[in-house]
Amino acid sequence: YLPRHNKDRGWHRFYSNLELVVIDEGHEYGGVMGTHVAWILRRLRRVLAHYGADPQFVITTATIGNPAAHASTLTGGEFSVVSEDGSPRGNRDIVLWEPPLDDEALEGYDDGSGDLMEGFEQARRSSAREASSVTAHLAVNGIQTLQFTTARQGTEIGAKQTVQAVRDHPRDGYIDVEPYHAGLGKRKRRSVENQLKSADLDAVISTNALELGIDIGSVDATVTDSYPGTKQSFWQQIGRAGRGTSDALSVLVGGKDAMDAYILDNPGYLFDDDTVEDAVVSIDNDRVFADHLLAAAAERPLTAEDAPYLGGEGRFREMTAMWQDAGLLEQAGDLDAGGVTYAGDRRPQSRISLYGTTGIDYEVVCTNGEIEHDPVATERAYRDYHEGALFLHAGQQYEVTEVDHTQPHPRIHVEEVATTHYTQTLSTKQVQDLEVKDHTSLAGDYDIYFGTGTVRITYGNYMVRDYQTGE
């Protein structure tokens, strides 16, 4: 709504009288998305200053190591930290679960080397299948459970495996279980959220899309398939169970990653406040900054007074001159006299994708049925929706028959199929054009380098797996 601030008197009054801006789950704004949000908030502060408003900003976060610094980088303002937690809470049992060895997979492994450690690790049941078994056991015993996994296809496969685990469970029963992820259509997501909140579902298998922000009430237990990568994500996920004074159970099923093994051997790491990670966001990405500078110019002419909001004096003038040379900003404009206006032929805000850098999304259409599928970003389209790809979506299997790149809005054509298989894309990565900007040395002769470069990802092959066996 920033572009409409001067086109609608309602927005004029709103911005003029704004006194408080609240940003929830501030720790989530990192990476490319965090960079976009940081520039949107600076554009907001610029428009507010135009109307003489100076509201207070309040940011809520999970436990992070740098709350004040992160909030400042995100908004450009200064912050004080309130860290005392006075919220009510019940008892919580946290279980760290190591998948057992799979005897069949271990048979015949000994190659004569005498070192069976790697074989033991590879012969463990997968964390995904083990998590599904734990979820099934809890749900069939009347404990409403929310399971977290790392990938969208993992939620779909996990839902199938959970149903199968209930069939194999010694206690007869039936459960309602649904997958949940951002690729589902909005109506389907809202349906799952409402059914979970009303306890009509016994279990939901979700990506981190349900980790925060969405009101689903309180479940009895959470199951996390593999360590989610940060302590803040871990605590956010287990916090979905037993809100208020209700008791809760949370199970972390360890994966094959080295970090999972470390946590299973050193559980105190999860409870050590001295090892809380920092939230990381940067506004140094010039490509993102350039797009937001055009958006700011379309919202109101750029002047020298905007430098504090838009990158600082030198960077602001340099990027303005670049866009003037390109013809997207008024070439005759002057930052010091009258300002510089936007000269492009369409809304520059439409160029910006908060979750990536291309802004191009693929529409998914089904040629022999119906599919409610949100648009697919370019990177995901190349990785997961190539021709021949098999995938589960809302419990239905589909095959990609054609990818049409020629349309203004590219399309992925799929067909409903009857199969128990899915595809897993294989990739190679090359890092080129490295430019080292800084480095440091660590104990043990380890060097860490920081710099810029080009990462080239090639998707050339894929595997076909059975979602019931993983083979």
Sequence positions of predicted segments:
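Walker B catalytic acidic pair
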Residues: 24-25, 226
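Conserved helix/coil segment N-terminal to the catalytic DExD/H
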Residues: 1-19, 195
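Post-DEXD/H (motif II) to motif III coupling segment of the RecA-like Helicase ATP-binding lobe
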Residues: 10-12, 20, 27-88
